[in-house]
Amino acid sequence: MTSLSESDAGSSARPTMRHVAKLAGVAVKTVSRVVNGEPNVAPETARRVLDAARALDYQPDPHAGNLRRSDRRTRTLGLLVSSVDNPFAGAVHRAVEDVAVEHGVAVFASSLDDDPEREREAVAAFLRRRVDGLILTTASTNQAYLEPELRRGTPVVFVDREPRGVETDAVVSDNFGGAARAAEHLLARGHRRFAYLGDLHSLQTARHRRRGFLEALDHAGIPVADVPVIEDLHDPERAREALLRLLDGPNPPTAVFSSQNLVTVGALRALRERGRHRDTALVGFDDVELADLLEPGLTVVAQHPEDLGRIAAERVFAKLNGDGSPSQRIVVSTTLIARGSGEIPPSGM
């Protein structure tokens, strides 16, 4: 294949068919035929074109015929959230869309269900659509695969979870501090027997919450090695079963911290199933719909997903408008809302 200089490849722009054609030593029309799966292309020629496309990280543009504006923007964003089952993700999505609408921009959204492979597939789909910017919640352990896109100048902002392997903006909750505050709240009520119910350990947010909760207990003199820590409880049923086992054990906790809203739902069901919802304290991370209507009301460390989504979207548009400031890590504070379940004292007090 023909060699291609950095200036030819346009290091600050996405590769085009022209770049692929030059590297493969063929006509642009030949590249178009290969990309579109048209017949009458020799197998060896098609192989050279595909090899060149891979080498340049070329992504076909399904809307190329519609791109005639001088700025070449599609007026779209790609948004990747954790799971459509989780109200938190829905609130982030809504906030991003509210900002995008103000700018006359549409949002393509997808959920990853905390699957690293799905993350990369969704991002690739967004890039094929030539979105102007990306707002991403991640599940994979490294996002270095986005480096070529960042070099081309595509604005990328991470929301809820920080990236690894790339330097760019991230907007996150104070997961460590919020979990520590939950522990301090329960300690202040006199509790000494705790249980921790955690989300997937592979998730950065879950690890930060676990660390915040356990370090606060440790600072208060609680032997954390004796605290039951049960993780990878990603849905209500697993959380329910885990807490039932603890409640039925020889030394049940007097206070429970659940590190995610769906886990909290399972914990609530277990406590009510055993008739322990009035004598076992519970604090959840993330608010739960109708939490104030329960009896007792549910005490939570509330995140502010609407702020996370809004700030992330504002950062993308700032970058699109020429903001070249260094990468920022923006931490959004959490709020402990006391409604009753977290204020239950241990039996005998």
Show which residues each predicted segment covers.
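N-terminal helix-turn-helix DNA-binding module of bacterial transcription factors
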Residues: 1-73, 343-346
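Short beta-strand segments enriched in small/hydrophobic residues
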Residues: 23, 28-33, 68-85, 185, ...
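Amphipathic helical "hinge" segments at domain boundaries
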Residues: 58-125, 130-133, 214
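Hinge/beta->alpha junction and helix N-cap segments in small-molecule ligand-binding domains
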Residues: 81-91, 109-118, 161, 170-181, ...
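Short helix-capping segments at alpha-helix termini
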Residues: 102-103, 152, 217-224, 249-252, ...
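Short beta-strand-centered segments that line the small-molecule binding cleft or hinge
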Residues: 120-177
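Periplasmic-binding protein-like
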Residues: 130-138, 195-197, 229, 250-260, ...
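Flexible loop/turn connectors
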Residues: 249-349
